Amino acid sequence: MDQGTIDGVDVAGNTIAAVCHVPGNILEGNWTAAIFVNDTASDAQEKALLKVYTGQAGGPIAELAKLIGKVVSVERAPITFDIVGAKGTLKIGTDYYAELEPYVGPSGAQTTLSDTVFSTVPGAPVFVGKAPVYRSKNAAIGIDVNLKNHNALQSTFRFEA
């Protein structure tokens, strides 16, 4: 969160992440999820973030939360993400790590899909790229993958209230 409060609790500087198993069509739901809150959040900040991201506070995030059928854990972990240009890395604890980088065209611009059903964020462009590294391991979710140079789709979104 760059800035913001939830029920009077300042949540700026905090991160929440979900690692999910999606058993089929992403929009049909029944996802299994492990939820992570950054390890520097206070108990009050964690409670406030979970209220929003589990859908209890309503709004657009509640619609997203409806897709999760089962939460197997809520954990504290270091969560880091670094973005340099259009390349980025994400690390959650010791069991999740991803690198993403875009494909670029001859002009150096990112390869973009617009007005496509392949967007995970309706109405937003999709940036096509690859994940040089993607590792994810969680026995409760049934995930244990270590992929190299796999496809990756990136998009942007912003929630404001």
Report each predicted region and the residues it spans.
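N-terminal ordered "arm"
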Residues: 1-5
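Extended, charged low-complexity segments
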Residues: 99, 103-161
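Residue-level signal for the start and early helices of compact helical domains
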Residues: 7, 26-28, 72, 148-150
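Charge-rich, amphipathic alpha-helical segments
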Residues: 22-25, 30-32
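Charged linear interaction tracts used for macromolecular binding and regulation
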Residues: 31, 35-124
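Short amphipathic alpha-helical surface micro-motifs
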Residues: 15-19, 72-73, 137-140
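Low-complexity, acidic/polar, glycine-enriched regions of mature
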Residues: 6-20, 35
